[in-house]
């Protein structure tokens, strides 16, 4: 259903900047060039999927922040995709006058280090077998995994035979791949994907080359695990990351220093930002309520796990985390 959600944040103007294609975000450390002392630490980012080279633009914008970390999603719509970027219209020092409704490109709001944030990623997929090392590749095509033809590995991991065409193709269509760089972990000891994993679709198979094509350029040395969407895993993983966030900000077991600060003079109490002020949840338009068991079921899980905090979000055509789409 069409909807509008609004979160009002009590953040001083010197600690954030709204940016867009007509009011770009200055690289961290270059704020003085335009008379501002603002240094972006992280950013909430919206992007148009139709923009050429959008993954590269996301990575480049992340490099403009001191942390190199951005979060958000691709704008999605039943019809025309637009982005709203409303600055201070010249009435707030350092905020600029560029405001409007935009098509294409990137927009969002950057925050400095004084605006404390915690971010987590949930994939909602389970690996069907161990992670493999890509040992031969050509663009989007995985030619070999662990020095075996990639198609042979796919058949073994999914327990299928492509000669049995219809059941095999149905299972391949329900399968995705989780990708990581060589130095990043792929699967945790508990069996879930690590936060660094990027989940991508399988876009084709090449029996002639015994290869598998995926929706991302791959390189030799990267790690790949075949995976499938799993409703129970998605619910458990969503609950887990919310619990991690709550524990990071409101630990059940306090350290001696924190306990002492809470009982001491209010001037040395923990910074208010350590208490959860609000949350933004970016979900995948490809799964939504039905995947979690009913309308709004996904948001109800987040609400229960985080507690009674202001909560907004949106369904994205693709999620943005770290420097990745």
Question: Which residue stretches match the model-derived regions?
Answer:
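Small-residue-enriched flexible segments
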Residues: 1-279, 284-291, 304, 314-325
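Amphipathic alpha-helical segments in well-structured domains
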Residues: 58, 295-299
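Catalytic phosphate/nucleotide-handling subdomain of diverse soluble enzymes
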Residues: 298-312
């Amino acid at each position: 259903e069409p909807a509008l959600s609004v979160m009002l944040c009590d953040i001083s103007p010197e600690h954030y900047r709204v940016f867009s294609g007509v009011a770009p975000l200055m690289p961290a450390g270059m704020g003085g060039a335009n008379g501002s002392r603002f240094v972006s630490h992280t950013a909430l980012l919206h992007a148009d999927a139709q923009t050429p080279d959008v993954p590269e633009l996301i990575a480049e914008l992340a490099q403009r922040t001191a942390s190199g970390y951005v979060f958000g999603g691709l704008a999605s719509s039943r019809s025309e995709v637009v982005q709203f970027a409303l600055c201070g219209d010249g009435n707030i020092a350092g905020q600029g006058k560029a405001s409007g409704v935009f098509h294409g490109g990137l927009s969002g709001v950057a925050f400095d280090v004084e605006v404390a944030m915690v971010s987590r990623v949930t994939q909602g997929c389970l690996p069907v077998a161990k992670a493999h090392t890509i040992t031969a590749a050509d663009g989007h095509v995985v030619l070999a995994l662990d020095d075996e033809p990639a198609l042979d590995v796919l058949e073994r991991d999914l327990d299928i035979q492509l000669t049995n065409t219809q059941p095999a193709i149905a299972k391949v269509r329900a399968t995705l791949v989780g990708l990581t760089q060589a130095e990043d972990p792929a699967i945790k000891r508990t069996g879930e994907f690590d936060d660094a994993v990027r989940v991508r679709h399988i876009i084709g198979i090449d029996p002639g080359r015994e290869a598998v094509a995926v929706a991302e350029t791959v390189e030799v040395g990267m790690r790949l695990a075949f995976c499938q969407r799993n409703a129970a895993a998605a619910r458990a993983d969503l609950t887990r990351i919310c619990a991690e966030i709550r524990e990071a900000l409101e630990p059940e077991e306090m350290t001696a220093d924190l306990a002492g600060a809470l009982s001491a003079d209010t001037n040395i109490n923990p910074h208010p930002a350590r208490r959860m002020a609000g949350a933004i949840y970016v979900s995948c338009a490809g799964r939504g309520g039905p995947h979690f068991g009913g309308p709004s079921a996904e948001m109800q899980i987040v609400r229960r796990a985080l507690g009674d905090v202001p909560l907004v979000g949106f369904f994205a055509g693709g999620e943005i985390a770290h420097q990745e789409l």
